[in-house]
């Protein structure tokens, strides 16, 4: 029996012997292809070669490609074949061999290398592919009755925009016992009898965004054999999950949870889902993906959270997925060395995300359980969309998870109302942004101006001044002939040296100067591609449409901005060196006085890491690296290794910014000519801006001197306040902290003493409600912790009874209630009691039957509310 590892090796060696270069798997994150989230097939990394956009180094290639597909996440574990992560064995020809070679090779491999019985093999071809039929029938010798012609839905391969073509599939007949029993059952039937193990795609066409097909200049071959699927056939098991590829991970998980595979259906399902999802997450994170709320980050988060949920089915309540990930790494690291290299990072990301979700799960699950119980008690058949949205919006509880848990309890979720609530939230967000967005009418005007005037010519990379003509003049969104001093205007020039805000870099400031007129420009942007709008104020004279002016950029401001932009590139590279290759730019702001850089990372950057990042940037600055800026083709830039932003749309020609051998990125911003011009680099803030996202803020050049001067002044002020010389600040501060700690301990001891005294005093105020001891009082407790402590002391002394204490803190009311366990059977519930009393002081709250707390905002009504406690208790006693 061949193992998964042996099948992988046998396949690659077979094609290596036939002139193919073995290449390592490409990343799961597609390189410079924003049209897809994941590498979902073996040919994805080779699309440019099939389309002619790039020239391959090798004409024949074979790979075992890591793949992720997520359309059917819910089916994972419930069927024999569905996976989110899988390995695709493939061989490729870029304008070299075609059908005449791959078809005989495929037959040779499966019948001689894998020793599959010929009588169990069937072939499908595209209905119009007579060429493939002839090769299978005449050259290979497959009887015509075992070659099945099928339509485009099954035998024409395409994944949206890109290379495509007819395909031929090889099927294995697994026997009548696996079939549907129909006498008409044959290849193409939806049952499990005929299993497709290899797809041979004949790349002949390119499909565009409109769905049109055009012949490719270079025909090619793309084949795909699912490793997990063929392993199930060769190992004689009914499910991919029963192959050695999965069983090793599933057995590890079962042992971890104290469970056994093959005994209970729900346990088996959980083990399968966890194994699948953990494989996907482990590989994705090793390739640079991080959990998040959008795009591939959302996919990773969803898979992790589903796996955690299924861990609870196994009885696991603590973080465990990182341990399963260790098993995945151990099993797969020989074939994929990057797993071992990134192991520490992968395990840390998974554990951090799992711990965060367990906190979310604890809070959300309790509320969802209550909602489910309420729905069942009222005879409802679903959880309301509003409740599902509240769980999502308040606790981060995913809709999919709410649906799964509700479904287990026989309930649905009103997704329509949930979606409506989501859309309403989006509308509110859009409304909040309207003040900074252009009105739709103005957008129409800009588009018309672009069509009428053509493109604004930008010369600002090489010049800071330009003789220009005013092509259009706008005031308040309307075209005007002229404007006078004091008026705010928008101006379109035929040529401009002004950089328009884009790519995170702020716009230039400038002066437009003409005979007897001057306009101050404080904003430049491109509301429509190709049209540059200059916004500013007329300082003197009268400006008219068609006037000739000289546009003069504020050179010091431009230089300061360029200094920070170049430093941003150095920072990006330094972050990757210190934190790892998973770091990617997620946003930036480049201004004259500072820079802000958002990036993907799973944890706060430590002080030591920040120091090292600063050192690396300043070393690059002091190295006086030459900064080269040049234009080239996108394909050439990729070959050179220039970094690009995922999701950014690039044209065929791109602008590359290269800083010695240290950094190379695609960038349209303005830059220095040497890194030495950065002067100095200093990070002044690092913080979180979302799950898996961090932000660094920094200054450069004279900004560093200003920053250090401000810090020095702060230290001088602190020294003055605590009456200490500068050189003794640390020692004096430590002494003050210790003194403060001692005083706090003394205060706490006094508070406890006072609390005990007050507790003793109010014990004489016990009343009875239907023979139940009730103690209710207003006390002097500075905060909720002290109030709870007093309630605990009273409960210990009373032994049996109901206690409710209230205190004020400024304009707030604090309430704590307790009910001893012997009274729970009489209908008394601390949460219900405190909730009722809290209403009387304008607040709310609740909690457990034995202890609960609440707050209010009407301290003047506290005594009145306390006086009602006995009455409320009487009403609750059964």
UniProtKB/Swiss-Prot annotation:
Its main location: cytoplasm. One of its GO terms (cellular component) is cytosol. The keyword Zinc applies. Zn(2+) binds at residues 565, 569, 667, 671. CDD domains: AlaRS_core. One of its GO terms (molecular function) is aminoacyl-tRNA deacylase activity. Binds 1 zinc ion per subunit. Its EC number is 6.1.1.7. Its cofactor is Zn(2+). The keyword Secreted does not apply. Keywords: Aminoacyl-tRNA synthetase, ATP-binding, Cytoplasm, Ligase, Metal-binding, Nucleotide-binding, Protein biosynthesis, RNA-binding, tRNA-binding, Zinc. Pfam families: DHHA1, tRNA-synt_2c, tRNA_SAD. Gene3D superfamilies: 2.40.30.130, 3.10.310.40, 3.30.54.20, 6.10.250.550, Bira Bifunctional Protein, Domain 2, Threonyl-trna Synthetase, Chain A, domain 2. GO terms for biological process: alanyl-tRNA aminoacylation. It catalyses: tRNA(Ala) + L-alanine + ATP = L-alanyl-tRNA(Ala) + AMP + diphosphate. It is found in: Cytoplasm. Consists of three domains; the N-terminal catalytic domain, the editing domain and the C-terminal C-Ala domain. The editing domain removes incorrectly charged amino acids, while the C-Ala domain, along with tRNA(Ala), serves as a bridge to cooperatively bring together the editing and aminoacylation centers thus stimulating deacylation of misacylated tRNAs. Catalyzes the attachment of alanine to tRNA(Ala) in a two-step reaction: alanine is first activated by ATP to form Ala-AMP and then transferred to the acceptor end of tRNA(Ala). Also edits incorrectly charged Ser-tRNA(Ala) and Gly-tRNA(Ala) via its editing domain. Belongs to the class-II aminoacyl-tRNA synthetase family. This is Alanine--tRNA ligase. It comes from Desulforamulus reducens (strain ATCC BAA-1160 / DSM 100696 / MI-1) (Desulfotomaculum reducens).
